[in-house]
Each structure stands twice: as C-alpha cells, then as structure tokens.
Amino acid sequence: MTILPKKKPNSSVGVSDHPDDPDRRTGSDPHQHQHQHSHGVRPGARPRASPPPWSYQAAPPASREDRRTESSSRPQQASPPPVGAGSSGGPGDATGMACVSGNRAELSGGVGCGGGMGGCCSGPGLSKRRRQATCSGGVAGGGTGPGAAGGGGGGGGGGGVGGPSPEQEEGAGYNSEDEYENASRLQSEDPATVEQQEHWFEKALQEKKGFVIKKMKEDGACLFRAVADQVYGDQDMHEVVRKHCMDYLMKNADYFSNYVTEDFTTYINRKRKNNCHGNHIEMQAMAEMYNRPVEVYQSGTEPINTFHGIHQNNDEPIRVSYHRNIHYNSVVNPNKATIGVGLGLPAFKPGFADQSLMKNAIKTSEESWIEQQMLEDKKRATDWEATNEAIEEQVARESYLQWLRDQEKQARQPRKASATCSSATAAASSGLEEWNARSPRQRSSAPSPEIPDPAHSDTAAKPPSPAGALALSKPPSPCAPGPSNQACVGPDRPTSSSLVSLYPALGYRAIMQEMSPTAFGLTDWEDDEILASVLAVSQQEYLDSMKKNAMHREPSPDSS
C-alpha cells in the first residue's frame, strides 16, 4: 500500500460562512474511511435525481430525532447527539467536530458538543477506530478535545473557543483513513493472531458458502483489481475499471460531490492514479455502473455491507473480501460463472462458452471413438472374410480331390464286373446250338442302309442270331447293375474270339453307363433314351456276329 504524506488537519469547523446567520455551520469533516463499510447505504433502487444542495443551517430537533432513529437501525453507525440547550451556536464557539449522519443521501452539519458532552463522529467514511479515538478524546466540562484527523476540528480550552488555523487548512478534504501515515500504526493486533483469523475466515467462507478467496496484488489498486477480476476475469484490467469508475463519477458529479469534502475535481484527479486507494464512493459508483450489487465480506460468512445499483435484477453480485482494514481480495464462486455480467453484452450467458467448448470436445471425442470402432470393425470383418474365403477354397480343393479319387475308384470297379460277367456268359453259351431264326429286330432293320454290299446279300438274307431278342426279352443279369447288363448278353453260341473282341467296348460302355449323368452336367436318363441306347448296342452286336459267322461258314475251295 502506498502511503501518502500526512497533511496538517484543518480546524475550520465551527467557523460560520455567514456572519448574519449564527445557526449556519460547516459540516466539513466526514473523514470517510476507504475500507470501512459500516456506513448505511440505503438498499434498493434510488432515483437518479441529484440530492438537494448542502444546507449549512442546523436542523431542528425534531428532524435530528428522526435521523437518529433512522441511523440507529443500521449496524455500526452512530447517530449524532441532539442539540443541547446549553450549546452555543455563535460563530466564535468552539465545536467538538462535525458529525456525519445518515446514508449517502443524508449528510448533517456540525453541531457544537459542549456542556460536558464528548464529541463523537459518525458517518459512512469513519471507522470504528477513528470514532473510538475521537470519542475518547471528547470535551469535558465545557472544553473540547482534539478533532478528527484530516478533516479539521480545532482544539480549544477554557472557554472552548477555537479559531481557524492556516496550518490545518492545508490537509482538509481527505476521505480515507488509510491515506495517512498513521494508518499502518493503528494495527495493534499480533500478526500471528491476524494470520490465524484470516485462515479461519477463508476456511469458513469456503465450507459454508463454497466461495474461494482469490488473492489480489497489494499495490493500492486492490479494490479495482478485485472488481476487474469479478467483471472481466482478469485483475490486470484494473486500470480500465478505474477509468470507467472515475468517468462515471464525473458524469454524476452533482450527486457524488455531496459526499466529498474536498474539491470534487481534485478528488477525481487524485483517484485516477493507479496507486490510489478506493473507498465506499467508488464501490457505489461501480455497483451502479455494472448494475450488480457489491457485497463486502470481513471475518464472517455474511456480507457486512452491500451496495445496490439503480435497477433491481437477479445478476450475481460482485463479492470482495476486506482484510486487516487495508486490503481487498476477490471472492469467487467456482460453481457459477459471473465473468462478463454487467458489461451490457447482448444475449450473454455466463459460462456458455465453457459449456459449448465442453460439448464440442465431447462430440469430437465421441466421433473419434466411433470412427476408431468402425475401423476396428472393418479390420475384423476383413479378417473374417479372408478366413472364410481361405476355408471355402480349402474345402473346394479337398472336395475336388475326393471327387477325383471316387471317380478313379468307380472306373476300376465296372471293369472287374464286366470281365466276370463275360466269362460266365461264354461258359454258359458254349453248349447251346446256334439259333438260325431271325430276330424281330433283324426283320425291322433288314431294309436299313447299314446292310452290307450286294456281294454279301445272301449273307444278309440268312436268319440272324436271336441275340437282339434275347437282349430285349431276358431280365437284367445280376452280374452288372443298370443298363450295362445287356452288354453281358451275346449270341447263343459265340466264339471265344468274338467275346474277347467285345470286351474293350463293353468295358467302356459299362463305365459310361455306371457314371451318374450329373457328372456330365445332365439329368437322369429317361426310359426312351435308355431303350434307344440298348437297341443301338444290340444292333451293333448282331451285325458283328453276322460278319463273323459268315466268315466261318465260307467253305474253302480245296474242300469241294
């Protein structure tokens, strides 16, 4: 904290500016403490109209009683004593000190506190220490004690008459007690005790209210830093807050100048310095400027003072904490965002940006997770498809190999069966005589173009062997299943050479007939197709047998 040099107090209290009116007195020593917030700011909205000008005439007893009643209802605010019968109102009388009463809108003039009554200061700017020190040094027995520091208040003895001092007029107009060098010397408490109280204060505020005290830099701008942290979220914006506050005070100088004892322009110019402290006047101005209540906490969980704006609303208040009667910190509610409230931003919702960022982050995370899961599913599906394809290929290969083995096995089985059947037929037909009757098949096929040339016409006219008839009339032989049993039936008395010559053809036909038509892409054979194939085989066998018989029956030329 920057301590300004102490100026000598001014003892201009009690000097009448109007000699013709003995009841007019100056009420010039409010000595408003910068950080003591026990003054009675009237809560709620107030009209923008400026208050009436300062009246130097002493109020009647009835009005003072009303003010005392109103002031006594507010905490930590003393009321000025009523005007006594023995008090003198002349311009030369020595008054104890100026008594400030009421809230911001009510300031009373100084009253002489003689007749053995001690002078007492009250008002929004005076701290307990100052009031106690002033009241303890009050007048007794018609004399007056020392006045309030910095505001003026002459000390007189004997008859109690004190005149204005040029040395005391220089320091008139300071409103804050901590602007004096003796402010630091007023701290009589033990530092360890103060530290313990501060720790208890922070702990109680956090446990009961959930608030957190945010430390501000101690450079004389702590109040503006705390408000900047509440409004802008950055304590380094204190210069902007100070500038706006001073501009607001200048625009409403007709109202706020009633609470400043010094020249208002000088006061504003001094407060524009970055190392100059702020007090209750600046708090009220900022409450109206941001239209947010300002709550001040000190060693307790309930605010000791609340400054209200002009219009009532439901916005979160600006919370500051007051420490050691000299420093302000910011009180933050971590569960509710208040940054930006009061700046006049349209459709502004505190914390909406953080919520939007959180939603966007969650959405992006979900999309990334979904894409990752889809990629994993595709990988698993690709592996599954490749595995299925490999399995299908392996099954097809094994099935094809098994089919080839089955075909080879089936191709070997009909050859053995046909050879056995042919040997049995040759043994059975060796004892039969040749049958010269012509078969019906031969009759029907006589005019066929397949008859041999005219040289063998006589051979064709002979009755053929009834092989075709036997092939059609006899039931299938069990030696060869299916339509191949006709291949086992030959002429009644064929020679062994003819049977042997038929073995390859019969074996091939048997293999073809044993195979399923589905192997060739065909359906099951019908009866007509089976009958046609049997007739063709029978005809071919008959023709072959006729040729062989004709060759054996031709007599040799030398035998005749």
Swiss-Prot record:
Keywords: Hydrolase, Protease, Thiol protease, Ubl conjugation pathway. One of its GO terms (biological process) is positive regulation of TORC2 signaling. Residues 271-281 are annotated as: Variable-loop. Its EC number is 3.4.19.12. InterPro entries: OTU_dom, Papain-like_cys_pep_sf, Peptidase_C85-like. The active site is at 219, 222 (nucleophile), 327. Residues 1-100, 141-190, 411-496 are annotated as: Disordered. Residues 417-430, 437-448 have a biased composition (Low complexity). Residues 216-222 are annotated as: Cys-loop. The keyword tRNA processing does not apply. SUPFAM superfamilies: Cysteine proteinases (SSF54001). Deubiquitinating enzyme that may function as negative regulator of the innate immune system. Has peptidase activity towards 'Lys-48'- and 'Lys-63'-linked polyubiquitin chains. Can also cleave 'Lys-11'-linked ubiquitin chains (in vitro). This is OTU domain-containing protein 5-A.
